[in-house]
């Protein structure tokens, strides 16, 4: 590969890294071409971009990223990079599901919002809620709190009326 082409690849990967909420490194050594096509289709369905890039070029593209040194340590053998643009957890779910049936696909490492996740943390990553799901849960909790305020106020008023009524009956 000529120098200009390498620079273009580094620039392209750097741009993808800057747009991504989550970056995942995988090893796919021993994965057949048909299985690799299946994997790419699964990633595509989940809104994830998956690229195979030379390790040295990925290392250069990740150099400005928080945790780049740790990620660079995982750049050995064949490396595929998954970019989660809208959902940083989507690649983890695809990798976990696909690797159950395909032992040739291995999760190496991930970086989400500057936090680096090791290979043994794939299960935790894949079970995390998305931002949208977390926002929905928070909105539900806030809604429940807001809805319970009038009930509490009504209970206080009802109790006050009951006390006044009892005092009135005792005075008669």
Curated annotation (Swiss-Prot):
Single biological process term from Gene Ontology: translation
CDD domains the record matches: Ribosomal_L10
GO cellular component, one term: ribosome
Gene Ontology MF, one: large ribosomal subunit rRNA binding
Superkingdom classification of source: Bacteria
InterPro entries referenced in this protein's UniProt entry, alphabetically: Ribosomal_uL10, Ribosomal_uL10-like_sf, Ribosomal_uL10_bac, Ribosomal_uL10_bac_type
UniProt key word rRNA-binding: yes
Keywords: Ribonucleoprotein, Ribosomal protein, RNA-binding, rRNA-binding
Family of the protein in this entry: Belongs to the universal ribosomal protein uL10 family.
Its biological purpose: Forms part of the ribosomal stalk, playing a central role in the interaction of the ribosome with GTP-bound translation factors.
Subunit structure: Part of the ribosomal stalk of the 50S ribosomal subunit. The N-terminus interacts with L11 and the large rRNA to form the base of the stalk. The C-terminus forms an elongated spine to which L12 dimers bind in a sequential fashion forming a multimeric L10(L12)X complex.
Protein's name according to its UniProt entry: Large ribosomal subunit protein uL10
Gene that specifies this protein: rplJ
């Amino acid at each position: 590969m000529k120098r200009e082409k390498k620079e273009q690849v580094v620039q392209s990967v750097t741009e993808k890294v800057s747009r991504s909420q989550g970056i995942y490194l995988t090893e796919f050594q021993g994965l057949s071409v048909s299985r690799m096509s299946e994997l790419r289709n699964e990633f595509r369905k989940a809104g994830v971009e998956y690229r195979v890039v030379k390790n040295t070029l990925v290392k250069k593209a990740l150099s400005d990223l928080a945790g780049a040194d740790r990620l660079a340590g995982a750049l050995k053998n064949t490396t595929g990079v998954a970019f989660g643009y809208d959902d940083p957890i989507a690649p983890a779910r695809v990798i976990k599901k696909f690797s159950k049936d395909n032992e040739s696909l291995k999760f190496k490492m991930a970086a989400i919002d500057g936090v680096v996740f090791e290979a043994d943390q794939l299960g935790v990553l894949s079970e995390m809620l998305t931002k949208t799901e977390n926002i929905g849960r928070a909105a539900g909790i806030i809604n429940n709190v807001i809805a319970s305020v009038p009930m509490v106020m009504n209970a206080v008023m009802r109790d006050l009326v009951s006390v006044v009524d009892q005092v009135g009956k005792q005075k008669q």
